[in-house]
């Protein structure tokens, strides 16, 4: 049996970029190691959730790990909160949130200039309203998670986040009668937090420095903790997660995986790429399954920066050299969780390239790992197929039937 390393480059898929004379960032990147893996791979295209579906990183990671989003997904908030180490109990409602910059009632920047440290702000806006305790914890850059703890709460509420700039933050609405209390308390929380943020020393200092204040919390993705089957019970694989992204850590934590903490694991473009794959090489000796998430490709896509996306891919390509000589003992899977084309600055419904690489498998005659070359491979799959194929190629699957 072989151990499995699943590398997910978040938002990997792209469209042709004029900056690269019609190539995608992946095609334009210098990627000798990824191409070498491709020559020892079964490869093709994957729809993370389904054809044409613009999946989020939450639903796509669930799908790739073999958990149907239709069954297990009820909101992103719980995963974000768990990934930040927050405790959630039955009846709690969790949200993901952005610190944003609002002026004259309009959202001018949903990321408040990609503010790097919001811990003081999160402590300041954690509060109690009526019989509900509201805890805010900062994530990477502008991101945060919010947990509501108290009686009679519901996740059936709308977002305050308009999901685009030059729009007003929205009033939270109950989506059914049982959610009226939750919506009322959330709207009061948003009002009070706005007053606190506008007067907070962190934001006053930022304005004096000519920076955007983080003076609004945009809330979205309400949910309660789903009952996710333990990964080991499901696949009999001892699993570990390497990621600087709270969402991914939260999904993997809920699935019972070990979360690996490392120095300089940022979840940003300035990632510790070399350290990640050194750690993966070390962990592959004692874990059956390792998932690695690289967030920088997605960040660059959202920022419409194909040059940075190419650079992230090249950094990954260089660092992956630490494990590509272990193909006698490893099955290495490389893919994205969705496409984030730089010309769109958002997720698209396009499929992503995927390859399953190891020695002694029926490799396809594909020389390059990119969105178009892998069309000549043998695979056209969905995310829910990945673990089944991985178990088969690693000689871990069980026979179906007599």
Curated annotation (Swiss-Prot):
Pfam annotation, one family: PhosphMutase
Region (Disordered): 155-174
Comp. bias regions, Basic and acidic residues: 160-174
Keyword Transmembrane helix among record annotations: no
Cited InterPro entries: Alkaline_phosphatase_core_sf, ApgAM_prokaryotes, Metalloenzyme, Pglycerate_mutase_ApgM
Source species, domain of life: Archaea
Task of the protein: Catalyzes the interconversion of 2-phosphoglycerate and 3-phosphoglycerate.
The protein's name in its UniProt record: 2,3-bisphosphoglycerate-independent phosphoglycerate mutase
Native species: Picrophilus torridus (strain ATCC 700027 / DSM 9790 / JCM 10055 / NBRC 100828 / KAW 2/3)
